[in-house]
């Protein structure tokens, strides 16, 4: 895939701006590229197609370096505890920020700049970081969420990558405008992984099963994997407060009796409802393929997914309007079920 990407980049050299700004750190190994003009501000101006092509050829194509050593060849791989991780030097990265740059020097990071290119990070831009990471001794790159995420009730302009909408699709915003529509975001991710493996860097992906987007695609087939409240009561939904504690506390088992005696906790637990499929399976099946599944459920069932919030008791921040918790168990916690008057109450977040 790297060769295919490089062929496309080479075909576009000379057909774009010569003032595409990049940090000079990215130019390692290609400092002598004719199209590079270095500035006093630590940047270089260049033809983006010429730069990325030269970078790929220098570090990833014209090389005799071996790819990342298979884990099966690691002497300690089969020992208890994941020894390959213990030996690794790991760098954590969020693509859209780690590889972001003000490429047109406008003073703003733009989703589409005056050259027609996005300035947030992409898999292609991440390739430019790999040589420097390798020089730092990094041999494992831990990728924070790269899946499609929800933008419903998003916080900020872009939304949270921790509000995953679909665990089986990559985030299209990580595709680079420099590559044509003949390349998918999956193709560009493959090229990035190929590049990393070529210089001995492994890729680890953060799957984050704890949280989901409030309108996760999994709702269509597994509404019972989520927590539900009445949509008409969402404005009343808030983090419960336990008067017996004057400050935030860790949710330890020894404190649970006091927590469940709190009137506000009782109010909170009673807000939860059974999932829409459990309430009316026929109706749910008739709407499950709606373009906006959560909107359809809110209209037909007056239900919505319960926003997540901090685990700590009396933690001040409000609920997170853009993410919901993924239900990991099909029963109530054994440490707290003794405090429930009705063991058959709907699943709840606390």
Spans of features found by a protein language model:
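Acidic/aromatic-lined carbohydrate-recognition and catalytic surfaces
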Residues: 1-350
């Amino acid at each position: 895939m790297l060769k295919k990407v490089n062929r496309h980049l080479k075909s576009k050299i000379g057909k774009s701006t010569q003032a595409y700004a990049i940090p000079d750190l990215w130019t390692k190994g290609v400092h002598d590229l004719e199209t590079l003009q270095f500035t006093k501000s630590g940047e270089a101006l260049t033809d983006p197609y010429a730069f990325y092509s030269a970078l790929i050829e220098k570090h990833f194509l014209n090389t005799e370096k071996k790819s990342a050593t298979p884990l099966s060849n690691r002497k300690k791989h089969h020992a208890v505890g994941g020894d390959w991780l213990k030996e690794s030097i790991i760098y954590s990265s969020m693509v859209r920020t780690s590889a972001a740059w003000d490429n047109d020097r406008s003073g703003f990071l733009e989703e589409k700049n005056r050259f027609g290119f996005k300035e947030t990070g992409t898999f292609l831009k991440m390739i430019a970081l790999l040589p420097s990471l390798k020089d730092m001794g990094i041999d494992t790159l831990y990728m924070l969420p790269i899946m499609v995420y929800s933008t419903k009730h998003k916080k900020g302009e872009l939304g949270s990558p921790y509000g995953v909408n679909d665990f089986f699709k990559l985030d299209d915003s990580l595709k680079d405008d420099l590559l044509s529509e003949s390349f998918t975001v999956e193709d560009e991710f493959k090229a990035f992984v190929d590049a990393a493996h070529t210089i001995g860097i492994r890729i680890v992906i953060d799957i984050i099963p704890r949280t989901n987007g409030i309108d996760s695609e999994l709702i269509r087939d597994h509404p019972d994997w989520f927590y539900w409240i009445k949509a008409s009561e969402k404005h009343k939904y808030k983090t419960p407060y336990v008067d017996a504690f004057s400050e935030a506390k860790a949710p330890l088992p020894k404190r649970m009796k006091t927590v469940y005696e709190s009137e506000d906790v009782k109010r909170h637990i009673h807000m939860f409802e059974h999932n829409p499929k459990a309430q009316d399976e026929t109706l749910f099946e008739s709407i499950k393929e709606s373009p906006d599944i959560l909107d359809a459920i809110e209209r037909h069932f007056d239900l919505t997914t319960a926003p997540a919030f901090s685990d700590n008791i009396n933690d001040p921040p409000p609920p997170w309007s853009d993410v919901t918790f993924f239900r990991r168990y099909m029963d109530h916690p054994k440490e707290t079920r003794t405090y429930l008057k009705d063991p058959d109450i709907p699943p709840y977040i606390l």
